Amino acid sequence: DIVITSNGGYPLDQNMYQTVKGLSSGEACVNDGGVIIIASSCVDGHGGEFFYHLLADYENVEEAYKNICDVDPSKTEFDQWEAQVLLRILVKAKVIVVSEDCDPKLFTDMHMMHANTLSEALNMARSIVGNKKITIIPDGIAVIVK
């Protein structure tokens, strides 16, 4: 299936770190192997070097997730929790970020996909999962999905 959401606009969509909050509602709705599309400007980039490198420094999502989950709870680092949430989402589903304001390489470095438009993102999602059910969450950061 496909979930489409947003982070509610600026300042909540200013960077990828903040965007994870909106992705969480999509995670609650998407089936394993599905696609979450999130519209988020990310005009300020990733939101923190440490956060970025917790994903970008690994070959794949599974390796990054295992590494972060293996950290002793008494030794966790600042921003680790948000990277762990994003990695948990990426283990479950593909993520496509719709943004015209950020270098697409930032998203691909962090194991996500990029689209310039919602139409482009939908075409990408359909090429991954087919013509599946679409769930729309207009303001993903402001809902609790059950």
Locate the predicted segments by residue.
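C-terminal non-catalytic interaction/assembly regions of soluble proteins
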Residues: 19-146
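Glycine-rich phosphate/diphosphate-binding loops and the adjacent beta-loop-alpha structural elements
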Residues: 1-18
